[in-house]
């Protein structure tokens, strides 16, 4: 992560690890062409002491829940202008429910205001640092300064938004709410 909490590089896939399970990176993070790194040549990361991540400021056990964590930021800073029948720029940032998500989420995705990894799209080749996620998301134009709205987001709020983007813009906090027939969290 950089100093603002934006991810420098990310994987094009995800993995789930249960408590007590261990996961290594051998297989993906090796030289693809040629010989592997010699065993007696430790990586930079392995030559340092383990670092314990700082728990996120938003609590919620670190679980990203759009309606619970992200929407309140839009409510605080955006809906004054971006709501109603003719929202500013025709971008509705309210939490009003849509078929699967809500107006703000749909607008951010459909208008490409946030960059995400569309798992259904083609062409997921290797990427370069700072080429995906929060680094290239247009939302930065609106939240990094107070020029857009005259309001300045708190650093923790910006970091939460960047984390949400770099986690690939999850909406539901658990799989329990990911089916159309479920109502999700009200």
Regions flagged by a language model, labelled:
Residues 1-186:
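Aromatic- and Gly/Pro-enriched helix-to-coil junctions and flexible linker segments
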């Amino acid at each position: 992560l950089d100093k603002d909490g934006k991810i420098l590089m990310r994987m094009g896939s995800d993995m789930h690890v249960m408590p007590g399970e261990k996961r290594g990176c051998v297989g993906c993070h090796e030289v693809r062409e040629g010989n592997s790194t010699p065993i007696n040549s430790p990586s930079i990361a392995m030559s340092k002491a383990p670092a314990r991540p700082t728990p996120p400021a938003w609590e919620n056990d670190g679980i990203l829940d759009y309606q619970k964590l992200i929407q309140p930021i839009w409510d605080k800073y955006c809906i004054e202008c971006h709501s109603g029948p003719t929202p500013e720029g025709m971008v509705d940032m309210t939490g009003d429910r849509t078929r699967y998500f809500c107006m703000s989420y749909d607008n951010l995705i459909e208008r490409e205001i946030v960059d995400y990894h569309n798992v259904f799209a083609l062409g997921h080749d290797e990427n370069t640092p700072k080429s995906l996620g929060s680094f290239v998301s247009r939302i930065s134009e609106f939240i990094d300064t107070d020029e857009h709205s005259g309001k300045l987001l708190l650093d923790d709020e910006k970091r939460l938004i960047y984390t949400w983007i770099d986690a690939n813009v999850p909406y539901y906090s658990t799989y329990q709410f990911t089916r159309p027939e479920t109502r999700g969290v009200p």
